[in-house]
Amino acid sequence: MKIAFFTETFLPKVDGIVTRLTKTIEFLTKNGDEVIVFCPEGCPDSYKGATIVGVAAMPLPLYPELKLGLPGPAVSDKLEEFKPDLVHVVNPAVLGLGGIWLAKTNNIPLIASYHTHLPKYLEHYGMGMLEPLLWELLKAAHNQALLNLCTSTAMVNELEDKGIQRTALWQRGVDTENFRPELRSEKMREKLFGKYQNTDSLLIYVGRLSAEKQIERIKPVLDLSL
């Protein structure tokens, strides 16, 4: 199968979306599928056998880490040359909307996936009044797809409540070779505890430090457990 991805987030950026995409691409190419990825410029030319096509992009004003790709005629030409059997749009934004339009106009089956909870970002950055409008835009985009993949059951339920149709859960995978109880290390625990007393409980947060992550919500739980 030949699969075309449209994503606003890709290498060299590292986050949960990129990790999921790179693992998916690696699995697909390993099993004989052909993959092309359209993403913001600054990316590598290839990854694990997949062709990567960078497009001109601009940073999102409220969130400069995220670049919005600007699809042009070259994207259409490259897609026509590749002749995909399936288009997968990741978090439809500017580049993603271009992917949706190209899939629809060329009668290519389309799926989409929802990763970044953009409506909640507006709330954290003082623009909550725009949340209803953004939901309407997301609904219009996602309802073009034959299938909308969500990364949690909570998001499946919320998207359905907002009128987004044909949702399904895209569960996370765990590499059991790298993450298993047998690899427990007392030396690593001591390093992580540092100057603090080594107790039975060790909580680790792995992720970005940003307002929308709401890391502060864990403090009341920690206070109750101490």
Residue ranges and their predicted role:
Residues Q171-P181:
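Short beta-strand->alpha-helix junction loop in the catalytic core
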Residues P109-I111, L118-A140:
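Nucleotide-sugar donor phosphate/pyrophosphate-binding loop at the beta->alpha transition
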Residues P61-V89, L95-W101, T105, P132, ...:
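An amphipathic, basic-hydrophobic alpha-helix
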Residues R180-Y196:
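A short helix/loop element that forms part of the nucleotide-sugar donor recognition site in Leloir-type
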Residues I3, L86, A103-Y121, L149, ...:
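Active-site proximal beta-strand in glycosyltransferases
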Residues G194-K213, I218-D223:
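Conserved donor-binding/catalytic core segment of Leloir-type glycosyltransferases
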Residues E41, A154, G173:
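Carbohydrate-associated surface elements
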Residues M1-A56, P220-D223:
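N-terminal subdomain of nucleotide-sugar transferases
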